[in-house]
Amino acid sequence: MSEERKVVASREYVISLRRAYVVSRTKRAKYAVGLIRRFVARHLKVEPSAVKIGQKLNMELWSRGIEKPPRRVRVSVEKYSDGTALVELKE
């Protein structure tokens, strides 16, 4: 049986994605997802592979296509007791 996950920490961030515009146009949105994973992993002390991107955040990143992700996103992050983190778009 699996244990129930408990929220250990809950935070809000504004993550700048301007570094995604340094890479070639055809890789920007995918690179922006990686930027968010690395940012959250660094701030919450989890592995980048343990960071889950919410569906609404993913839709926002890809809304203008692969070539033009947003310059910044406001997110809410929850860290769970099992060492994972969930990143959702702040509304």
Curated annotation (Swiss-Prot):
Pfam families assigned to the protein according to its UniProt record, in alphabetical order: Ribosomal_L31e
A single GO BP: cytoplasmic translation
The entry's keywords: Ribonucleoprotein, Ribosomal protein
PROSITE patterns reported for this sequence: RIBOSOMAL_L31E
InterPro entries with a match to the protein in the record: Ribosomal_eL31, Ribosomal_eL31_CS, Ribosomal_eL31_dom_sf
A single cellular component GO annotation: cytosolic large ribosomal subunit
GO molecular function: structural constituent of ribosome
Coiled coil: none
Similarity remark: Belongs to the eukaryotic ribosomal protein eL31 family.
Identification of the protein by name: Large ribosomal subunit protein eL31
Gene name of this polypeptide: rpl31e
